[in-house]
From Swiss-Prot:
Pfam families associated with the record: Oxidored_FMN
Coarse class of the protein's main subcellular location: other
Spans annotated as FMN: 342-343
InterPro entries: Aldolase_TIM, OxRdtase_FMN_N, Oye-like
Entry comment describing in which tissues the protein is expressed: Expressed in roots and to a lower extent in leaves and flowers.
EC number: 1.3.1.42
Chain residues that bind FMN: P31, M32, T33, G64, Q106, R237, G321, G342, R343
Family per similarity comment: Belongs to the NADH:flavin oxidoreductase/NADH oxidase family.
Name of the protein this chain belongs to: 12-oxophytodienoate reductase 3
Motif (Microbody targeting signal): 394-396
GO molecular function: 12-oxophytodienoate reductase activity; FMN binding; identical protein binding
Binding site for substrate: H185, G186, A187, H188, R283
Localisation per UniProt entry: Peroxisome
């Protein structure tokens, strides 16, 4: 093992410079949908939630945030496309900054992973394809029940530029709200991933068919956002080997390398590195199911992650079921610069301190992941020794 519990040499607690941002540790809050933004407006409870998980020199990535009225696939997720949303996000960002943390907003369009109930005028969700997500999966409905994903509408070639513009405008809105940067969600079977994966994308235009064509949409989105706010404020998340929501690809490694190649070129042409590349490892748990994708063994997973890590010229964040020990190992072995934690951060608002001390962890309650209660299962998980978000143990 790379480090003992409290030997002072825990690599997760070595400082790191992520471009223009100086981080005091390498434990990152992963973006996680929590469904507490009533009517798509960030609420005060979100401020408390993120403040609880903020540490001086820490790095937080928000839950997936809608870039347009067509981009929702869960009830009560926040948006960043209206003035009111920007205004309410600014209150949350200010609270996080007061704790000395860095925070990025994850820009999200779910594509076909939606339902008419979430779409303006009850329209069909847009996607790269007309193929619906299979009945293996269910969508969470506003009333808490689970429904079947409907048939999407394949977006017209002429419409794609507007979606790219939605990403660009949302990135500018995020900066207006005070965010330090944004993360483009290109993973987990959502819209960008629906263009990337050959198991979904069946287009015959310039956005489908060849690997180069399937990478065109994500390239245009990244270029547009970089031109708007600067490369050093932009992170990108991808999951080439994950088949969540039927997002399968015949050659995940080639796909991942193709995306990395394009990100490296964007960095070269912009004269500045992106903030980071955030990759979810193949073994990923979502909705209580483990999705191993096409790569199942630990050896295969490690090979894919290391290949992408070595190919990408910049900060590399790994994600997906990491424990304290696996996070230490990833950084110590050079497999990642930063490690993002999801479910462990839900039930342990002071996860950073718990990892530092190798303290016991609270268990999470999956039943409260996607409810609208602003307290239960959201901001009521206990801190070490009963300290609140401003207690001495929550500060590093």
């Amino acid at each position: 093992m790379a480090s003992s519990a409290q030997d002072g040499n825990n690599p997760l607690f070595s400082p790191y410079k992520m471009g223009k941002f100086n981080l005091s540790h390498r434990v990152v809050l992963a973006p996680m949908t929590r469904c507490r933004a009533l009517n798509n407006i960030p609420q005060a409870a979100l401020g408390e939630y993120y403040e609880q998980r903020a540490t001086a020199g820490g790095f937080l990535i928000t839950e997936g945030t809608m870039i347009s009225p067509t981009s929702a696939g869960f009830p009560h997720v926040p948006g960043i496309f209206t003035k009111e949303q920007v205004r309410e996000w600014k209150k949350i960002v200010d609270v996080v900054h007061a704790k000395g943390a860095v925070i990025f907003c994850q820009l999200w369009h779910v594509g076909r992973a939606s339902h008419e109930v979430y779409q303006p005028a009850g329209a069909a969700p847009i996607s790269s394809t007309e193929k619906p997500i299979s009945n293996r999966w269910r969508i969470l409905m506003p009333d808490g029940t689970h429904g079947i994903y409907p048939k999407p509408r394949a977006i017209g070639t002429y419409e794609i530029s507007q979606v790219v513009e939605d990403y660009r405008r949302s990135a500018l809105n995020a900066i207006e709200a005070g965010f330090d940067g944004i993360e483009i969600h290109g993973a987990h079977g959502y819209l960008i991933d629906q263009f990337l994966k050959d198991g979904i994308n069946d287009r015959t235009d310039e956005y489908g068919g060849s690997l180069a064509n399937r990478c065109k949409f994500i390239t245009q989105v990244v270029q547009a956002v970089v031109s708007a706010i600067g490369a050093d404020r932009v992170g990108v998340r991808v999951s080439p080997a994950i088949d969540h929501l039927d997002a399968m690809d015949s050659n995940p490694l080639s796909l991942g390398l193709a995306v990395v190649e394009r990100l490296n070129k964007i960095q070269l042409h912009s004269g500045s590195k992106l903030a980071y590349l955030h990759v979810t490892q193949p073994r990923y748990v979502a909705y209580g199911q483990t999705e191993a994708g096409r790569l199942g063994s630990e050896e295969e997973e490690a090979r894919l992650m290391r290949t992408l890590r070595n190919a990408y010229q910049g900060t590399f964040i790994c994600s997906g079921g990491y424990t304290r020990e696996l996070g230490i190992e990833a950084v110590a072995q050079g497999d990642a610069d930063l490690v993002s934690y999801g479910r462990l951060f839900i039930s342990n608002p002071d996860l950073v301190m718990r990892i530092k001390l190798n303290a016991p962890l609270n268990k999470y309650n999956r039943k409260t992941f996607y409810t609208q209660d602003p307290v239960v299962g959201y901001t009521d998980y206990p801190f070490l020794q009963g300290n609140g978000s401003n207690g001495p143990l929550s500060r590093l």
